[in-house]
A protein has these predicted regions:
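Substrate-recognition element of Asp-dependent hydrolases with the DxDx(T/V) motif
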Residues: 1-49
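Asp-based, Mg2+/Mn2+-dependent phosphohydrolase catalytic module
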Residues: 37-38, 43-135
């Protein structure tokens, strides 16, 4: 039962998104900032591994709200992440799948993009992004 609930919450990781992250990481710093909890994070890591990816391959650093004891969309979580990474919000492209978080990122100074959560639309969107990433 728990496994089924976790599967519903995590969904399937979009392979096109993972491919884009690998390409982007060749040219840019890539960070993950997530409100995920420990159980769902472990499930996501397991799914990444099953697809042949590791967090070290995809991200320079991972920031998880449960470990930081802060949560998006609070400004404190963005402040801590930028302080630890040295990121300049004005030159940082920030993707989020929740409108309130994308808007909070924009108010913080990020170039903020709201990504689609419909699996078909998201797949198509990331396919297009992949075409436009120069390697």
């Amino acid at each position: 039962m728990l496994e089924k609930v976790l599967e519903e919450l995590c969904g399937n990781l979009p392979v096109e998104r993972l491919k884009a992250l690998v390409k982007l990481r060749k040219r840019y710093k890539v960070y993950l900032l997530s409100n995920i909890n420990d159980t769902l994070w472990q499930k996501s890591v397991s799914q990444m591994n099953q697809l042949g990816y590791s967090t070290d391959e995809l991200f320079d650093e991972v920031f998880l709200s449960y470990a930081m004891r802060k949560e998006k969309p609070s400004v404190e979580i963005y402040e801590e992440m930028t302080q630890q990474t040295g990121l300049n919000p004005a030159t940082t492209l920030y993707f989020d799948d929740r409108a309130e978080n994308a808007e909070a990122g924009k108010r913080f100074g990020f170039q903020s993009v709201l990504v689609k959560t419909n699996h078909l639309e998201e797949h198509q969107e990331w396919q297009e992004i992949n075409k436009n990433i120069k390697e």
